[in-house]
Amino acid sequence: MTKKPGGPGKNRAINMLKRGLPRVFPLVGVKRVVMSLLDGRGPVRFVLALITFFKFTALAPTKALLGRWRAVEKSVAMKHLTSFKRELGTLIDAVNKRGKKQNKRGGNESSIMWLASLAIVIACAGAMKLSNFQGKLLMTINNTDIADVIVIPTSKGENRCWVRAIDVGYMCEDTITYECPKLAVGNDPEDVDCWCDNQEVYVQYGRCTRTRHSKRSRRSVSVQTHGESSLVNKKEAWLDSTKATRYLMKTENWIIRNPGYAFLAAALGWMLGSNSGQRVVFTILLLLVAPAYSFNCLGMGNRDFIEGASGATWVDLVLEGDSCLTIMANDKPTLDVRMINIEASQLAEVRSYCYHASVTDISTVARCPTTGEAHNEKRADSSYVCKQGFTDRGWGNGCGLFGKGSIDTCAKFSCTSKAIGRTIQPENIKYEVGVFVHGTTTSENHGNYSAQVGASQAAKFTVTPNAPSITLKLGDYGEVTLDCEPRSGLNTEAFYVMTVGSKSFLVHREWFHDLSLPWTSPSSTAWRNRELLMEFEEAHATKQSVVALGSQEGGLHQALAGAIVVEYSSSVKLTSGHLKCRLKMDKLALKGTTYGMCTEKFSFAKNPADTGHGTVVIELTYSGSDGPCKIPIVSVASLNDMTPVGRLVTVNPFVATSSSNSKVLVEMEPPFGDSYIVVGRGDKQINHHWYKAGSTLGKAFSTTLKGAQRLAALGDTAWDFGSIGGVFNSIGKAVHQVFGGAFRTLFGGMSWITQGLMGALLLWMGVNARDRSIALAFLATGGVLVFLATNVHADTGCAIDITRKEMRCGSGIFVHNDVEAWVDRYKYLPETPRSLAKIVHKAHQEGVCGVRSVTRLEHQMWESVRDELNVLLKENAVDLSVVVNKPVGRYRSAPKRLSMTQEKFEMGWKAWGKSILFAPELANSTFVVDGPETKECPDERRAWNSMQIEDFGFGITSTRVWLKIREENTDECDGAIIGTAVKGHVAVHSDLSYWIESRLNDTWKLERAVFGEVKSCTWPETHTLWGDGVEESELIIPHTIAGPRSKHNRREGYKTQNQGPWDENGIVLDFDYCPGTKVTITEDCGKRGPSIRTTTDSGKLITDWCCRSCSLPPLRFRTENGCWYGMEIRPVRHDETTLVRSQVDAFNGEMIDPFSAGPSGDVSGHPGGPSQEVDGQIDDSCGFGGPTCADAWGHHLH
C-alpha cells in the first residue's frame, strides 16, 4: 500500500534510505572524482598528490585547490609530504641501481649511451662556460640551461647544480653574479634559486629579454617645481598654466578694489551688446582687459615711434629683443633702429645631471654567520655602487649555523641620458643692431639688406661689453654714433641654461643646484649621488637584485613648468634683454633738401598698404626724367581743403635717379578716419582715399598701454624708463613715462572742474541726440570723463616732471612744491587685515616682539589698522595687542622679517561693527610698532622691510596702495615707487620719501636733496643712474640710509655724511650758507666730525666757520630745529660744551668715520697726536693704538 509523501520513510513504496547506487558509466565516475578533487573536495592525500602533479608539470592549480591547500593543517600536510619524499627517494634509488645494471651489459647499448653523453657535453659546452670569480668556480649560463640539472665535472666527482631563477635571459651588459650554495642531502633549498650538491659555485647570466625592456624600479625621483620665472621676456614659458589663474585672481581683486571702474565697464558692456549673450561676453572681456592697465603688463609691440623736438642732438633709446624704434626729428632723416638678435656664446658648463641611468654587471658576495664579513672586490672600482647588508642563513642555503650572514652587492652605474647646465658670462653676450634710413628706397631694395648697405642706407653692427660704442657711416646722410650700455635683463649669476634632451630652458641657479639627481662636474667623470637612480631590492640569502629607475625626463619637464624655453646649439638666443643706447644725431643730415619739386606725373604702382603700426606704405612710379627731385605728397582730410593732416614718416622723400618709371617707397601716418593721400601738383595730381580705423581717444589709451607694458618690462633693468634726453617731450617718451597718460594726454591741461563740466555737457548732448549710436557714444564718453575727473587714479610705475618738481605714480601726485613741503595723497593698506593679524600672531610666537616701519606711509598703515588687528586677535582668543608708538628720529632697520602664511583669522559682523566705535582693551602681551628701543622689545627682536607694494587702487581723496608680505629677505627699498630720470642738465632720483637732484655744470654734482623722512633701506641698483665704479666713501647721502650708489650723489670737497643730522625732521640738504654765518677755507681748520648746528643750546648763533678743502658754497642741512653744516665744516674756536652735535652714525655696525677720529674727536683747532691727511682733511683715526690706517680704512680711500 502506498501513502502520500510526508510519512516515515520505511513505510513508503520506495524506501529512500535503502536505495541502491545508480548504475553509472565508469569514465563518468572517474571524471566526477577528478572534478571534485579540482574543486578541493576529497581526501587530503589525493589533494596534495594533485597539487604535486601540477607543480611538476608547470600547470597552474585551480583556485579551489589552492584554497584547500591553505586550509590543510600543518601537521597533516607535513605527514603526507614526508611520505611523498620517501617515495621519491625510493624511485631515485631504483633509477640509480638500474643505471648501474645497464652499464654492466656492454655492447651496442653502451656505444649509444656514450654518444648521447658526448652530445650532452658538447651542448653544455656551447651553452655553459666555466671560469673563476673570487677564487671559486663561475658558470655562465643562458635561459636554455635552467630546464635541466647542470652537471659540472670536478676532482671530487660530478657537481650537480640546479638553477631556478626566473629572470634568466640572454647574455648582455645587464648581468648578475651570485653564489649557488652547497646543500647537504636531505636539506630543502630555502630563500635561494640556485644550489649544488657537491660544492658551491658562482652563477652568472644576462637579464636581457627580446620581448620587453629590462626590469626597472617603480620609484621616481621627487623634483621640486621650478615655478614661474621672474624674468620679463617675450617668449612663452614652458607648460605655463599659472599666469591664467593668477590673472583671474588679479581681475577679481581689481573689481573689488575699483568698483567704480568695474561698474563703468559693466555698463559699457551692457550698452555695446544687442542681446543678452553679447552683453555678457562684452562685459567679461572689458573686466578682463581693464586690469591690464593697472599692473604688470607684459608683451611689447614690435615698433615704437619717437618724435623729437627741434634742435635735438641726441636721444636715449631702449631696444628690446625683436623690437624696432622709428626716430623722427625735425630737419633729420627718419631712422629705424632695430634689435636684430641677442646672443650669448661660449657658455661654460657648470654641472651635468643624470636623469636616465642603466645598471649593469651586478655581483653579490655572501658569507655564512661567523665566517667573517663579505667583501666584493669590485668595491675598488669607482664606477660601481656597492651596498652591504645581512640576510638569514641556515641549512637551507648552505650554512651550518643559523643566523645573520653578511652580503655585499655591487653594480656598475652608467648614465644613458644627462641634462647639462651652462652659465652665461656677461662678456660673451652680443647684441646685433641694425640702423636703416628712410631714404629713397625702391621696392626692389625694400627689405634687401645688402642692397641698402650698398646704397649707404643701412648698417649693421654688434655691441659687446668690450666694444660698446660705434660710429656708422650712412653716405650722404652723414653719420650716427651709438654709445650703448648693454643691459641683458638677465642676471647671469642667477640663471643657467639647462638642456634636457632636445629642449633648453632658462632656470634659476638655486633650483638647478638643489636637484636630487646624480651629478658630475665638467672636470670629473665620476657621478655623485648615484644611488638616487638605483634601487637595491630586498636581499635574499646569496642574491640581491639591483634595478635602475626609469627615465626622469618626464618628471623634469613637468617640474620645469614656468621656466623660459630658449634655443641652444653652440650659442643661445636670449629673448629677455635690453640695450640702452645714446644715438647722437648731430652729424646726421637730410639728403635732397635743395632738390626741386618733381613736375611730372606720379602713379600708384600698387595700392597703398597698411603696415599694421598705424602707418601706410605707398609705392609710387614717376614718369618724369628730371630727377633727382622732391616728391610732393601730403595727406588731407578733404580734397576741397588741402590743409595737411597726419605726418610723413619718410622725411623729405625724393626720386633719386633721372631715369623714367623709377619706383620709390614712401611711408606716412594718416589721421584716424577718412583722409586722402595726394601726390603731385596741378592737373597731374593723383589721390587715393584712405580710411584708418580707430579714434584719437582709443589711440591715447593704446599708446598708454604700450608705455605701461614697456615700463613693466624694463622695470628692474632700465633706469631711464624709456627714451629720454634731447627729446623729453616726444610722443614715445610721454607714453613710456605715464601709465594713466591717456586721460592726461587728452584732458590733462584742464582742471577737474572743467573736466567734470565737459563730461556733463557730453552727457546732456547724449540724452538729446536722436541717433542711437551717437547718443551712446556721447553718454559713454561723458560718463568716462565725469568718473575720471572725480577719482584719483593710479597705476604701478612713477613718472617724474623735473621742471615742475613733481613725481607722479599714476595720477596720485607726490609734489615737492615751492615752500618745500611734502604733499602726498597715498594711503597704504594691508592685503587683508585678517591675514596680517595671523602673520603678527605667528611672528610673536616665533620670538618677534615688534616691527620697525620702513617709511612714514607704512607707519600710518599700522596706525590705521591697529584697532582692527586687535579686535581680530581678541576674537580669536589670542592674548596679544598691537601697539603703535610715535617714531623717533629716522626710521631704523631691524634684522628679522615677517613670514607669509596662508591662514587667516575670522571675525563676525558684530565684532567688526564694535571695532568701528570702540577700541579693544589692551592685552597682556604686546606687539610694538616703531617708537624708542626698549629692553622689552629691542631692535634685535623686531622685524623690518617685510612688505612690498602689490597693487595700486583708486579712491575719491587718495590713491590706495596695497601691501603684501615679501617672499625674499632683502634690505632694498621697494622699487615700485621709485622714479629716476635725466633731462638735459638735471638728473633726479626720487620716491615717495626722497627727492635727490643733481646738475651738470662742467661735471655732474649733487645739487640738493629733500627728505620726507629718513629711512634705512638701500636704494636698488636697478633704479640707479651712473652707478658704475662708485666708492661708498664718496656718497654724500650714505647708502645705509637709502642714498643711491651713484656718481650723481657726489660733490667735490665732501665725503659721506654718515654723521649728519639724519634724526631731525624735515631735512633739506643743499649747498648754501646758513643765515648769518660765513665759511672760510683754511689749513688751520679742524678735522671732520659730526655735523654741528649753527645755533647753540641757548639759541646763540655761531657765525664763524671753516673747512680745510671743501668747495663753496658749503654743504648745509636745513631742518625744523635749525641749520646744520656738513661734517667737513667746523666752528672756529668755540666752547665745545654748548655745541649741538649730530648723534647719528649711518655706518653699519660699530664702524667709525674713516675720515675723522670718530664722535669723540675734537671739533675745533688742530688735533693732537699722530694723524694723516685724506683729501685735505686731517685724520687721526690711526692714533688710538689700533690697526694701521691702510688696514682699517683702505677700502674707503681712493
From Swiss-Prot:
<feature type="disulfide bond">
    <location>
        <begin position="354"/>
        <end position="415"/>
    </location>
</feature>
<dbReference type="InterPro" id="IPR013755">
    <property type="entry name" value="Flav_gly_cen_dom_subdom1"/>
</dbReference>
<keyword id="KW-1168">Fusion of virus membrane with host membrane</keyword>
<dbReference type="InterPro" id="IPR038688">
    <property type="entry name" value="Flavi_propep_sf"/>
</dbReference>
<feature type="site" description="Cleavage; by host furin">
    <location>
        <begin position="219"/>
        <end position="220"/>
    </location>
</feature>
<dbReference type="InterPro" id="IPR014756">
    <property type="entry name" value="Ig_E-set"/>
</dbReference>
<feature type="disulfide bond">
    <location>
        <begin position="849"/>
        <end position="937"/>
    </location>
</feature>
<dbReference type="Pfam" id="PF01003">
    <property type="entry name" value="Flavi_capsid"/>
</dbReference>
<keyword id="KW-1162">Viral penetration into host cytoplasm</keyword>
<feature type="disulfide bond">
    <location>
        <begin position="1085"/>
        <end position="1106"/>
    </location>
</feature>
<keyword id="KW-0945">Host-virus interaction</keyword>
<dbReference type="Pfam" id="PF00869">
    <property type="entry name" value="Flavi_glycoprot"/>
</dbReference>
<keyword id="KW-1164">Virus endocytosis by host</keyword>
<dbReference type="GO" id="GO:0016020">
    <property type="term" value="C:membrane"/>
</dbReference>
<feature type="disulfide bond">
    <location>
        <begin position="1074"/>
        <end position="1123"/>
    </location>
</feature>
<feature type="disulfide bond">
    <location>
        <begin position="484"/>
        <end position="581"/>
    </location>
</feature>
<dbReference type="InterPro" id="IPR013756">
    <property type="entry name" value="GlyE_cen_dom_subdom2"/>
</dbReference>
<dbReference type="Pfam" id="PF00948">
    <property type="entry name" value="Flavi_NS1"/>
</dbReference>
<feature type="glycosylation site" description="N-linked (GlcNAc...) asparagine; by host">
    <location>
        <position position="142"/>
    </location>
</feature>
<dbReference type="InterPro" id="IPR038302">
    <property type="entry name" value="Env_glycoprot_M_sf_flavivir"/>
</dbReference>
<feature type="site" description="Cleavage; by host signal peptidase">
    <location>
        <begin position="794"/>
        <end position="795"/>
    </location>
</feature>
<feature type="transmembrane region" description="Helical">
    <location>
        <begin position="280"/>
        <end position="294"/>
    </location>
</feature>
<dbReference type="InterPro" id="IPR002535">
    <property type="entry name" value="Flavi_propep"/>
</dbReference>
<keyword id="KW-0946">Virion</keyword>
<dbReference type="GO" id="GO:0044167">
    <property type="term" value="C:host cell endoplasmic reticulum membrane"/>
</dbReference>
<keyword id="KW-1165">Clathrin-mediated endocytosis of virus by host</keyword>
<dbReference type="GO" id="GO:0019031">
    <property type="term" value="C:viral envelope"/>
</dbReference>
<dbReference type="Pfam" id="PF02832">
    <property type="entry name" value="Flavi_glycop_C"/>
</dbReference>
<feature type="region of interest" description="Disordered">
    <location>
        <begin position="1151"/>
        <end position="1178"/>
    </location>
</feature>
<dbReference type="InterPro" id="IPR000336">
    <property type="entry name" value="Flavivir/Alphavir_Ig-like_sf"/>
</dbReference>
<feature type="propeptide" description="ER anchor for the capsid protein C, removed in mature form by serine protease NS3">
    <location>
        <begin position="106"/>
        <end position="127"/>
    </location>
</feature>
<protein>
    <recommendedName>
        <fullName>Structural polyprotein</fullName>
    </recommendedName>
</protein>
<keyword id="KW-0964">Secreted</keyword>
<feature type="glycosylation site" description="N-linked (GlcNAc...) asparagine; by host">
    <location>
        <position position="924"/>
    </location>
</feature>
<dbReference type="InterPro" id="IPR026470">
    <property type="entry name" value="Flavi_E_Stem/Anchor_dom"/>
</dbReference>
<feature type="glycosylation site" description="N-linked (GlcNAc...) asparagine; by host">
    <location>
        <position position="448"/>
    </location>
</feature>
<feature type="transmembrane region" description="Helical">
    <location>
        <begin position="774"/>
        <end position="794"/>
    </location>
</feature>
<dbReference type="InterPro" id="IPR000069">
    <property type="entry name" value="Env_glycoprot_M_flavivir"/>
</dbReference>
<dbReference type="InterPro" id="IPR037172">
    <property type="entry name" value="Flavi_capsidC_sf"/>
</dbReference>
<feature type="region of interest" description="Interaction with host EXOC1">
    <location>
        <begin position="2"/>
        <end position="15"/>
    </location>
</feature>
<keyword id="KW-0812">Transmembrane</keyword>
<keyword id="KW-1170">Fusion of virus membrane with host endosomal membrane</keyword>
